[in-house]
């Protein structure tokens, strides 16, 4: 990590956590728990509480156990961000999104003992995806960003070796 990159990292965290928490606040105060608000033929806002992690995994863990697990993962992610080469900007951006999303969900878990989820994708009455939130979306987009940069690096290395 360089001093030059830290302000961008901090700004990214402030934006991801701030947007996530603002939307969750709006959902909590405008959509009753367990109520679905259709937006599009395949998308609804559906206010639920998730006591686990993604897809309700680890929902049998204690409240403090999940907080501890999240903190350990955050420390590891911060270490990865800090030790990622400066020229790997997409990877660094990906880690920023992942860390911001994890912090957003950690705030919920500390304050409410659960995570506020509200995004529901579905196809008619045939398929319903797990309800999730914007923090989960940031985490997913961060992983995708890292995978893209790794694939591009791999393709570049492969083409360099074959020449």
From Swiss-Prot:
Q: Which UniProt keywords apply?
A: Aspartyl protease, Cell inner membrane, Cell membrane, Hydrolase, Membrane, Protease, Transmembrane, Transmembrane helix
Q: Which Pfam families match?
A: Peptidase_A8
Can the keyword Zinc be found in this entry's annotation?
no
Per UniProt, subcellular location reads as: Cell inner membrane
| Membrane-spanning intervals of the chain | 8-28, 61-81, 93-113, 128-148
Its predominant location is: membrane
InterPro entries in the record: Peptidase_A8
Task: Give, as in the UniProt entry, the pathway in which the protein acts.
Answer: Protein modification; lipoprotein biosynthesis (signal peptide cleavage)
Membrane topology per the record? Multi-pass membrane protein
Role description: This protein specifically catalyzes the removal of signal peptides from prolipoproteins.
The protein, known as:
Lipoprotein signal peptidase
Species source reads Bartonella henselae (strain ATCC 49882 / DSM 28221 / CCUG 30454 / Houston 1) (Rochalimaea henselae)
């Amino acid at each position: 990590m360089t001093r030059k990159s830290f302000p961008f990292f901090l700004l990214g965290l402030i934006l991801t956590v701030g947007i996530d928490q603002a939307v969750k606040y709006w959902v909590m105060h405008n959509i009753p728990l367990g109520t679905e608000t259709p937006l599009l033929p395949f998308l609804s806002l559906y206010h639920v509480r998730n006591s686990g992690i993604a897809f309700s995994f680890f929902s049998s863990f204690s409240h403090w156990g999940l907080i501890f697990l999240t903190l350990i993962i955050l420390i590891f992610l911060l270490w990865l961000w800090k030790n990622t080469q400066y020229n790997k900007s997409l990877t660094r951006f990906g880690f920023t999104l992942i860390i911001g999303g994890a912090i957003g969900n950690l705030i919920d878990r500390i304050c409410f003992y659960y995570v506020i989820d509200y995004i529901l994708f579905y196809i008619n009455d045939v398929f319903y995806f797990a309800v999730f939130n914007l923090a989960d979306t940031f985490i997913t987009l961060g992983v995708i960003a890292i995978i893209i940069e790794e694939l591009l690096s791999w393709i570049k290395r492969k083409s360099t070796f074959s020449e």
